[in-house]
Every structure is written in C-alpha cells, then in structure tokens.
Amino acid sequence: MTRTQPSASPTPSRAWRAIAALMFSLVLAPVAMADEPTANASTPAAAAAPATPAAAPAPAADGSAPVADAPAAAPVDAPVAVDPGVEALVEDTTLGMAHDLSPWGMYKNADIVVKIVMIGLAIASIITWTIWIAKGFELMGAKRRLRGEIAQLKKSASLKEASEVSNKEGTLAHTLVHDALEEMRLSANTREKEGIKERVAFRLERLVAASGRNMSSGTGVLATIGSTAPFVGLFGTVWGIMNSFIGIAKTQTTNLAVVAPGIAEALLATALGLVAAIPAVVIYNVFARSIAGYKAQVSDASAQVLLLVSRDLDHQGSERAAPHMVKVG
C-alpha cells in the first residue's frame, strides 16, 4: 500500500490570506506617516503660546485615530505680540538719546520764546563787557591826565600863570581855570571878596558834578543788566519747563530721557541770565569805586583853582591898599 506524500506548496487559502495582509499593511503605512508630522507640529504651537490656559492634547500617533480629529496648530513663524508700553519706552529712549545736549544744540531745540530770551541775555552780556573795556580805558586815561594837571596847578603861583600852563582846550584844568577867570572878570567892579569866592566856588562845584556825571555815563546800563538779567532768565526757564510739562502730557510718559532735554533747555536760560548779571554787578561796583576816586581828584583840582583865586584877590586888595606918595611943592 503506497502512502501519499504531502505537497510542499501552500494551499490556496493561505496564499490569499498572505496577500490580503500585505495589501492591508501597504494601505495603513501612508496613514501612519501622515499622522506623525501632525503630532510633531502641535508641540511647537503649544510652546509658542504659554499664556493659553489649557493646551489641546496632541493626537495619538497610531493609525486608530482619524486624521480629521487633530486640532488646528498655530503656524510656527507667527509674530509674537509686543506690549505697547515697551514699544513706547524704546521709542522715547531713542528720542531722548537723539537730543544734542550741548549749549548750541539746546539753543537750536528750544522754543522760540526761550530763544528770544537767550539772544537778549547774550546781547546784554556783550554790552557789559564792551562797557567794561571802553569805560576802563577812559577812566585810566582821565586819571592819568588829571594827576599831571593837578601837579601843574600846584606849581602855579597865580591864576594867570595857571591859565598859561593849562592852555590845552578840552582838559579839565583848562575848563576850571577858564571859568574862574570868567567869574572874576564879571565881578571886577565888586569890592566884596567873599562874594567873588562864593560865586567862583559855586561854578567850580558845578563843573565837578558835571565831570562826575560824564564819567558815570554808561554805568547805569550795568546796574540795569545786573538787576534784571536773572529775572529774564527765570522767565525763560519757567516758559521752557511749562512747554516740557505740556510735552509730557502729550506723550503720556514720564521717562527721564524724554523730559530731561526740555528741562535742560529751560535751565540754560537761567544760566545765561546769571552769566550776564554777575559780571555786570561786579563791574558796576568796580566802576563806582573808580569813579568816586576820579571825583575826588577833580575836587582836588577845583580846590587848587579856588586857592589861586583867593590868592589873586588878596594880591589885588593889597595893591589897592598900598599908600601912594604925593610930591608937594
């Protein structure tokens, strides 16, 4: 009895099951590959938005979950929202650093009223130094000439001799001697010596006062600048600070980089006021003392002329009182 050998080839049912399994695996492979990028993309979206109270869970990577159920993920390159206050702070800081804080730069950026105040104070300062130079040379020259004229008057023995010595017109000694001679000529027929002396002294006194007024001309401007320049500068400061506060209200920020340039421009006006006022006050006091010394020298010259007048009057009286010899027979 012969035994039948089993066939080595698979049966048709097993072959079909193997083919069906292979085709099913090929169908599920694209679905699994499509689900994996979706899960990876949802992770950066959750990290980019930490302020979200509850993040949506990432879909499962297996193929059992349908693709349509995955939540929509935010794009990775979406712009991050910036706080408006931070943007304003950065912008204000940039504007503050852009200001030129040199004196010329602050002048250019100042308000028109503050500019006018600064220009006026600068002109006042120039006037102060101009008066100091001009009046200083004038006083030094006048004092030097007057010392020489007083020395010449002291060497003179009579008013006529003094007029010959001080014959240069325009000098103070010439003016004093000329007025004294004019008064003596007008009072030639007067016998009262004291009346002549009083009239000559009065005329010399007026000349001394006039010379003092002439020498003091221009110094009143120094007093005016010294007393008003600080207040003018303060006005410019108040105006500039007022504009700074208005700018603060408009920009709605108290950042020091924005506020400081406007306040610095305002304070520059006060600084210019002090620069104009302090030298004016000092120079005015120096001139006041120097002019007082000049007036004292003029008074000395006037006293010397009055001394010569008194001497001439005494000589005239002695000549009139001298006896005359009369030849008899």
From Swiss-Prot:
It holds the Pfam family MotA_ExbB. GO terms for biological process: protein import. Residues 1-17, 135-219, 288-329 are cytoplasmic. One of its GO terms (molecular function) is transmembrane transporter activity. The chain crosses the membrane at residues 18-34, 112-134, 220-241, 266-287. It is found in: Cell inner membrane. InterPro entries: ExbB/TolQ_transport, MotA_ExbB_proton_chnl, TonB_ExbB_1. GO terms for cellular component: plasma membrane. Residues 30-83 are annotated as: 8 X 5 AA repeats of P-[AV]-A-X-[AP]. Residues 35-111, 242-265 are periplasmic. Sequence repeats lie at residues 30-34, 37-41, 44-48, 53-57, 59-63, 66-70, 71-75, 79-83. Belongs to the ExbB/TolQ family. PANTHER family: BIOPOLYMER TRANSPORT PROTEIN EXBB, PROTEIN TOLQ. The accessory proteins ExbB and ExbD seem to form a complex with TonB. NCBIfam families: exbB (TIGR02797). Involved in the TonB-dependent energy-dependent transport of various receptor-bound substrates. Protects ExbD from proteolytic degradation and functionally stabilizes TonB. This is Biopolymer transport protein ExbB. It comes from Pseudomonas putida (Arthrobacter siderocapsulatus).
